[in-house]
UniProtKB/Swiss-Prot annotation:
InterPro entries: Restrct_endonuc-II-like (IPR011335), tRNA_endonuc-like_dom_sf (IPR011856), UPF0102_YraN-like (IPR003509). It holds the Pfam family UPF0102. This is UPF0102 protein tll1737. Belongs to the UPF0102 family. CDD domains: PoNe_Nuclease. PANTHER family: UPF0102 PROTEIN YRAN. GO terms for molecular function: nucleic acid binding. HAMAP family: UPF0102 (MF_00048). The lineage of its organism: Bacteria, Bacillati, Cyanobacteriota, Cyanophyceae, Acaryochloridales.
Length: 124
């Protein structure tokens, strides 16, 4: 299953680069979990991108339902850990995005990109 996720993340990273984003890290891990993609957009905003890759027929709205409030909290804690470990990015504004990738018969494509899918306030 990790292979499917890796392919989906590669599609999203490539798309972000076409949007002039700089990829800062992929699969960054800490005790809180893993951040799929960390990027910086042309305006200097640090993007924490959660990628969900699913087949055409799935039960969780292409992975969107898997981004529960609990998952959001873990992503926020992981993002804080990343920023603590990388002080050069601490003063930049940050955003939490979700990328939904579909795969069918070996083909992967970015189905939907949700910029600012959730915020610190959305999980209170």
């Amino acid at each position: 299953m990790r292979h499917v996720g890796d392919r989906g993340e590669a599609v999203v990273a490539a798309w972000l680069q076409t949007q002039q984003c700089q990829i800062l890290a992929q699969n960054w891990s800490c005790p809180w979990g893993e951040l799929d993609i960390i990027a910086c957009d042309p305006g200097g905003v640090v993007l924490f991108v959660e990628v969900k890759t699913r087949g055409s027929y799935n039960w969780d709205r292409d992975g969107l339902d898997a981004i529960s409030p609990s998952k959001q909290r873990k992503l926020i804690l992981a993002a804080q850990a990343f920023l603590e470990s990388q002080p050069q990015w601490q003063e930049h504004p940050c955003r939490f995005d979700v990328a939904l990738v579909r795969h069918q018969r070996g083909a992967y494509h970015l189905h939907h990109y949700l910029a600012q899918a959730f915020t610190l306030d959305s999980i209170k």
